[in-house]
Amino acid sequence: MGIPDGSLLDLIDKVRSWITSDSSDSLFLLSSSKQDFGIMPIVSKMCHDCGTKVEQGYCCLSCGSCWCKSCSDTEESKMKLCRECDAEVRELRVKSYDKVHPRDSPDPPSSLATESESLASSLEIRDCRNMASIRCYPSRGEEEEARYCGKQLLSPSSDNYQDSSDIESGSVSARHELFSCKSSAGSSPHDSPLRNNFSPLGRFVQHAKDLRSPTVCSFDNHQEQLLADNLVKPGQGVLEQEDHEEEEDKLQQPLDFENNGRIWYPPPPEDENDDAESNYFHYDDEDDDIGDSATEFSLSSSFSSHIPTKEKLGENSNEPLRTVVHDHFRALVAELLRGEELSPSDDGSAGEWLDIVTALAWQAANFVKPDTRAGGSMDPGNYVKIKCVASGNQNESILIRGIVCSKNITHKRMISQYKNPRVMLLAGSLEYQRVAGQLASFNTLLQQENEHMKAIIAKIESLRPNVLLVEKSASSYAQQYLLEKEISLVLNVKRSLLDRIARCTGAVLCPSLDSISTARLGHCELFRTERVLEQHEAGNQSNRKPSRTLMYFEGCPRRLGCTVVLRGSCREELKKVKHVIQYAVFAAYHLSLETSFLADEGASLPKIRLKQPGMVRTASQRRIIDEGISLITQSPTETDSQALLETAAHEDEHTAPMPEHEVCESLCEDFDPTQIFPPSSEVETEQSDTLNGDFANNLVTRSYSSNQLNDLHEPTLCLSSEIPETPTQQPSGEEDNGRGEEENQLVNPQDLPQHESFYEDDVSSEYFSAADSHQSILVSFSSRCVLKESVCERSRLLRIKFYGSFDKPLGRYLKDDLFDKTSSCRSCKELVDAHVLCYSHQNGNLTINVRRLPSMKLPGEQDGKIWMWHRCLRCAHVDGVPPATRRVVMSDAAWGLSFGKFLELSFSNHATANRVASCGHSLQRDCLRFYGFGNMVAFFRYSPINILTVLLPPSMLEFNSHPQQEWIRTEAAELVGKMRTMYTEISDMLNRMEEKSSLLEPEQSEACDLHSRIIGLIDQLVKEKDEYDDALQPIFEENLQIQGSLDILELNRLRRALMIGAHAWDHQLYLLNSQLKKASVFKTGDDNAPRNPEMHDPPKIDRRMQEGSDERDEQSHTDSEANGDNKDPENIPSPGTSLSERIDSAWLGSFQNLEKAETIAETEGFSAVNSSLRRLARPIRVQSFDSAIRFQERIQKGLPPSSLYLSTLRSFHASGEYRNMVRDPVSNVMRTYSQMLPLEVQKLDLIVGSAPTYISSASQMADGARMLIPQRGLNDIVVPVYDDDPASVVSYAINSKEYKEWIVNKGLASSSSSSNLNNRESEPSAFSTWRSLSMDVDYIQHAVYGSSQDDRKSPHLTISFSDRASSSSTATEGKVKFSVTCYFATQFDTLRKTCCPSEVDFVRSLSRCQRWSAQGGKSNVYFAKSLDERFIIKQVVKTELDSFEDFAPEYFKYLKESLSSGSPTCLAKILGIYQVSIKHPKGGKETKMDLMVMENLFYNRRISRIYDLKGSARSRYNPNTSGADKVLLDMNLLETLRTEPIFLGSKAKRSLERAIWNDTNFLASVDVMDYSLLVGFDEERKELVLGIIDFMRQYTWDKHLETWVKASGILGGPKNASPTIVSPKQYKRRFRKAMTTYFLTVPEPWTS
């Protein structure tokens, strides 16, 4: 949105001419920057009404529509708006009247014309250059004066956690060397970083309503008047604003900073006289008189005359400001005196020093006025000098408005005192200069010298000086002649002293004798010398007191220097006081400038009220002026200036309650600045924003020795004053008052007494200065061009020393760096208004935008006037824009404020600098601060930034993650459904059999027993089903996350138990059906009876298996008889015996051993229907695995069974005990398979492998999983194998006994490979037994490194096993053979012991994985992710596997050292590499795949963006950025960084750089390149999750060839970008540099 062209006066005339016109255009001026008013030539336009091409006509001033002359004549003689726009303007005009708030606007206008005339006059910017008005400060009203009476507070100084040598240190102007090229062409930005930014309240700022054409700009003068009328007047209650704060937030409208020109348009001035063109910046010397002595100090005489207010108000109006400033400054001086071991108490001279130093420092700081516009030094220390005189009383110390030096006149007869003297300064020496190379006699030389001196003295006398100061010596002739002429001569004056005298007196130093005639003399009120006798501890040999002569130049006309003369009896004490004054002057000087600046901005003291009574401690050794805490008297004009100054306790044990209605009036003696932070419950703000306290709440200094500082290892709070700290030592002879570095002053919160507490929230967000430097701020600066969308200057650290040689006054920074219309950027050649400048510090970013107003100028450009105003973004918008305060002229003091201090105020959180008197919102946080000069306007906007922390791959992997449990719920739900379906089928079959058995002859004993057995089976079925329901029910409870994590291994065990139970029930039903058929045949005697279609023949029995069973029966019977078979039914037999009989009974399909089966059933503890030996044994309820024993032990001890969930405390131990906390649901599964003999295993395998006869759902129980009966894993872990999931095959293999046994044996055989392996308990196994089941273990010497005795020899393990297909449809296909080769099995096992809580966690995660379409990869290899998202499974190509085998020993060594030492590393840990082979017998198809198991860096994280960074710009851009899990590349990141830089804390940045340095150094040493840094943004936790991946590729010959081809450009590609593939060393350097550039650091308040 633009501003109308042409002169503003012409515009006003047009507005006035329209006032009497038609009402449609009487109020609004709608114009376009590219159009003129009225009739104009129109080229290639079509008439709006008739559609004909017109060459001349009228255009609508709003939408640009045109009419031909004939159409316009038919309507009106003069058309300015079309009908549509005219109607819209009328409607807008009517609405605008209703928008005027009653309390914010004056009385309604009496007529339309009156309002319009007043509008025009208010918008008129008059040219009044002839109205001379010499003013030191702009004028304000009394209500406005009451607002800024608290703006004097010093902000805490910034932290400096790095030495200057560590960063780029330079001036503010140094960074603006970027804008050095001159350019006459102007441009304006078309983009802005704030266009997509959010306001401090998180609202998107966007223009509310545009007119029809976005290119046509309209400015509504009436709306501007409404905006001015709606400005909240100073003095209006803040409480009313608070009550409507929520309503105001809701009323905010979207705002477009770039296209809404009214945002940039300056508001009316606060003082109409400020619009006058005048020579504004002149000092008013009428107020310079500070009195003859500063011996006595009082509020009325000292502070009232030096408070920097806009105009002198009444005493009552200034009282709160003077009180706050006085108390604050006295407290600061008192703390500085304590730092020099001068306790400011009532006793002794130090108490008097407090008043003296406070008075002298304040007066000196307010006297000097550095001429910063002329390039003078900003440092007040260069203008205030301190002389220590060890003579007299300390009360005789005085401030001299001029120069005092230790000099004397050359001759005693020369005049030593002048009033209003004329001072002449001469460089060099006052002697005759003999011409070299010429011969002359002695007499001739004397004569020549005499004549020459006469001539020189004659020239000097012609200027009529009274005092002549010469840098070096003077000849005796010259001295004699000067004595005769009554000119006092001073010799051997240092050049620096001459410069100071010249600066203060106005004299010009003569460089040589030849330029005496053109010299300019200086003036002062009084020149005098004084001889003083000093007192020293050790006198000289003659016991005479040493004397010195002081020379005074008093009453200098220019306020560019003064001298503080300290008197006292002890020189050492005077030196300490001198140090205090040096820092106190600096603080007072900045306090004055900051107060004026905050007053110009409209800031006020925060209004705070006590919530609870405070505690005031008393100390006898400290003087307390006020009794307790008193309330500042509130007057009607002091509403916005009332301040509660908190009182912190003295370090004393005794406390006294403080009345709730009392507040502190004096800060100096009422509080100990080491204890200024009250409990958070004691104070609260009246506003919604957080109270962080004013400057008084930030004043804490405490001196520590260097030894004490070295002991502070914990993060410390730097509770020190923002002003420079007192140096511990300074050379006694040092004339300059340079503020040297001082030892750190840190307060560790742990060192504070227990009764002291901090604002925990406020202290963390409060702005504190660092201990290493209190005189500079460290910021990150960057610049970008919005026109070319390029980064002109990447972010770099910039240290700005306050008021130092590299600092700039705020006014000069604005004029030279922002408002210079000719300077252009060296990088993009564009002007400054096409750029966006950003300064970052702590958690904030200060964005600077500049706009050139094309059609208006602010007055006072020739006089250097800079205007200030602001717009609050949180207040209700007026006509679509935030309300603006009236603009004021930047005062002279604010002009000279340090730009570094300005930045510190902008980033500071202390309450004084964050208040706006008119609305109570934060000035720095919630407002746009505008500065205008001529037709240039700049605004500063603060926006919070997220300081991200860096999360490196953890040393110990986390497995207990609740969000990833949903898939287990789904698995459990499916299992419950199948279980219920199965038991429903069994129940239906038993019910039908029960009906058939009831039809048998009741007199037959067999029929009666059979019926009873069926009834018992039905009861038992119900019990089993209930037990499964109880085991699975907790899965669906709501408090899942409280109980722990679901265990997929337990679900696997239940699934396998159900599958075996289903087949066992199917065989039982078959046997039961056989008995029913036999009974039916016995009843009817008809052998040819038709068979029940539901009844089937038993499967054919392998004769070998049957014979084996018979032999087993015999052996079991013999053993039973030998041991005494007639036992109590409560006794439990051997699990192997009962399991053998149970398998035989299910296998043989007969009742040949029913007595034995029944006995076994009884001894198992299961109740039978009756004791008949003819009864069929019910399904045996056996606890799976060895957990049955533990289950019974828990019951006997009275402990409940453990739940299905994993304990959050990790129930298993390093020994592998997994089942100790997992509940075993009851099922009809046989006892532990580890106790089964091979023959029994084969029988069970045939039972499960056969198709079920009666239970159709049994075949669907496995659901595609190979349950592999029996399981060979330890600790009862069941791992199913899926054909489409190679990771499950790996999980099964590493859980096998063979793998564990091999690892243990290998560790024992080679103890050097891993000493930790001996700590693991080796469990016994029947390895020889399993060998009979075709289990083979191969030891492969896969690679040989050097000799056979080389420690780098790494054997690999191959485990092979097979399984029959799980479903009946594929049972005939034969057994599927699996083979897993574990590369570097021992080394990876050792690594997992270090990184994983237990091997079971690793097995559990790998047991279930799913195919994953990873984004960003180009290799199209197999990718999978474990269902718990803990691991990534990636296929490894042969070249990568070969490379890894080559550097694997170094990899394991590097990780071991990093994990053990805690050294940071970014490497994403590889926890295993395996080769999986699956061979199907049908067709002989074999699948081989090399897999790598790597930790998932983003486990349990909500990642919003993912970047794959290599540090290269070649082919590193992903144009498709939409969709979830899209992997972006380097150029995508650089594109984002232009507007959204990534900021890291200094500690996080150092940790990241150190990790990258370590890892890249290792990878380069093993010749690896082409790795990537995978970065994920977790916005919820504000973390940067990252790790280095793809580090398995060495720089082999094919990569050499790729580098050469890409570098030559044969295959195309960008020529200015280096190839992605380079040598490892080059890759390392490029990678390090890029990662350092990508992630920026922001200076933080705390250092480590």
From Swiss-Prot:
GO biological process: phosphatidylinositol metabolic process; stomatal closure
Bias kind Basic and acidic residues: ranges: 97-106, 1084-1130
PIPK domain span: 1316-1639
UniProt-annotated stretches for the region Disordered: 97-116, 241-276, 721-746, 1083-1139
Pfam families: Cpn60_TCP1, PIP5K
Catalytic activity: a 1,2-diacyl-sn-glycero-3-phospho-(1D-myo-inositol-3-phosphate) + ATP = a 1,2-diacyl-sn-glycero-3-phospho-(1D-myo-inositol-3,5-bisphosphate) + ADP + H(+)
EC number annotated for this UniProt entry: 2.7.1.150
GO molecular function terms attached to this record: 1-phosphatidylinositol-3-phosphate 5-kinase activity; ATP binding
Record's keyword annotation contains Iron: no
Uppermost EC category: transferase
UniProt-listed SMART domains: PIPKc
Coiled-coil ranges (or none): none
Required co-factors: Mg(2+); Mn(2+)
Keyword terms: ATP-binding, Kinase, Nucleotide-binding, Transferase
Primary role: The PI(3,5)P2 regulatory complex regulates both the synthesis and turnover of phosphatidylinositol 3,5-bisphosphate (PtdIns(3,5)P2). Catalyzes the phosphorylation of phosphatidylinositol 3-phosphate on the fifth hydroxyl of the myo-inositol ring, to form phosphatidylinositol 3,5-bisphosphate.
Assembly mode: Component of the PI(3,5)P2 regulatory complex at least composed of ATG18, SAC/FIG4, FAB1 and VAC14.
The protein's name in its UniProt record: Putative 1-phosphatidylinositol-3-phosphate 5-kinase FAB1C
Species, as recorded: Arabidopsis thaliana
